[in-house]
Amino acid sequence: DLDIYLKEENNEIELNMYLLDICPEYYVLNNQKHINRDFKKITFVNDDYEYSATMLDKNELKYSLSINYGNNLFEGGSGTGKTTIMLSRAIKLARVYPQHRFIVFVSSKKLCNQLKEELEILYKDNNNLEIHTLSSFLFKLAKKFDLIADYRMFKQDYEKYLNNLIKQARNVIKNKNMFKGIFIDEAESFKVEEIEFISEFLYKTKNILDIY
């Protein structure tokens, strides 16, 4: 009888730790609020730093679990969880398609470093998901494809410097279809031309472009 095996109450902490291990993309780290009241917040140590993790709520899980090809727009004001959903979706898709590459674009170096830290904890076996600002991505392209990077221009006119690298990348890189999925956080911080340039690095078919 199945009831024999289910007679004892589940240990909520153990269940939460198990889910964090097998579905890390369903959790948010170091969040101030308790998102999902069905699960307790758990605390753990990684590399001598203490972290807390809470499972996403049902609405956020719904967006995280959906895998739709094409362009997807996620709207919402500041503090509504768009960045949390974005990272969750990016990790989910990277785990579902380990043979393909994915990339997240953010508008600031601070957020970039923060998400990289979270990614290192939540996606321990990561070798196919990158997080960049537009400038760090362009610097990577410059190094890989021997683009001419005039660092004097970088100090004098940052915007002109980036535009110059974008122009070179368009002319030099013949096959730009590098990523199955691209995720752009705080898209209002990017120019239309920059988003168009970023989009050129998607696969031609069966691609995913999420804009937040």
Tell me the role of every PLM-derived stretch:
Residues 1-212:
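The feature marks helicase ATPase cores and/or their adjacent C-terminal helical subdomains
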